[in-house]
C-alpha cells in the first residue's frame, strides 16, 4: 500500500486520458489544481498545457517557466493549490522515466497516463522523494466530482 493517496474524480481522469489521446503520438502535459490539507490531497481542476519540447515530443515533454507561473497564478486566483503535473507516455508504460525524475520536483504529485496506439491503458501517480533519488507510488482514489467550484 502506498504512503500517499491522490483523490481525483473519474471525470478528471477521463479528461487526462482524452488529452493524451488528442496529442498522440506526442506526450501531453498539464497541471493538477486542487487542495492539499488535513483531509488529503485532491485534484479538483486540470490546466492543460502545451508540450514545448521541440526535439523529441514523442518521448519527452517540457513545461516552460512561463507556464509554471501561469498555472500557479491560476490556482491562486481560484483559491486552489498547484498540487502536481500530469503527462502521457505514448506506447510506453505509465512509469516515470529517468528523464522524468531528473526534471521533477519533490512534494508534487505526478500523474502519468499510458496511451497505447491511441488508446488509454493505464494511469498512475507518483511523488518524488525529497532527496530526488526515486519516486514513491501514490495511490489514486476515485471521488465524486465537486460542483460549484
Predicted regions and their residues:
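Conserved beta-strand-loop surface patch within small alpha/beta domains used
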Residues: 1-82, 90-149
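Conserved, mostly hydrophobic/aromatic
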Residues: 85
Amino acid at each position: 500500500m502506498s504512503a500517499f493517496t491522490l483523490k481525483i474524480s473519474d471525470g478528471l481522469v477521463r479528461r487526462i486520458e482524452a488529452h493524451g489521446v488528442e496529442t498522440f503520438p506526442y506526450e501531453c502535459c498539464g497541471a493538477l489544481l486542487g487542495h492539499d490539507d488535513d483531509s488529503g490531497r485532491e485534484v479538483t481542476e486540470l490546466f492543460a498545457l502545451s508540450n514545448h519540447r521541440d526535439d523529441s515530443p514523442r518521448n519527452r515533454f517540457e513545461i516552460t517557466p512561463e507556464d509554471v507561473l501561469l498555472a500557479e497564478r491560476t490556482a491562486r486566483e481560484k483559491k486552489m493549490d498547484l498540487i502536481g503535473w500530469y503527462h502521457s507516455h505514448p506506447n510506453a508504460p505509465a512509469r516515470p522515466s529517468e528523464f522524468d525524475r531528473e526534471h521533477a520536483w519533490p512534494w508534487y504529485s505526478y500523474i502519468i497516463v499510458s496511451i497505447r496506439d491511441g488508446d488509454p491503458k493505464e494511469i498512475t501517480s507518483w511523488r518524488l522523494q525529497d532527496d530526488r533519488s526515486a519516486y514513491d507510488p501514490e495511490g489514486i482514489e476515485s471521488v465524486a466530482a465537486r460542483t460549484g467550484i
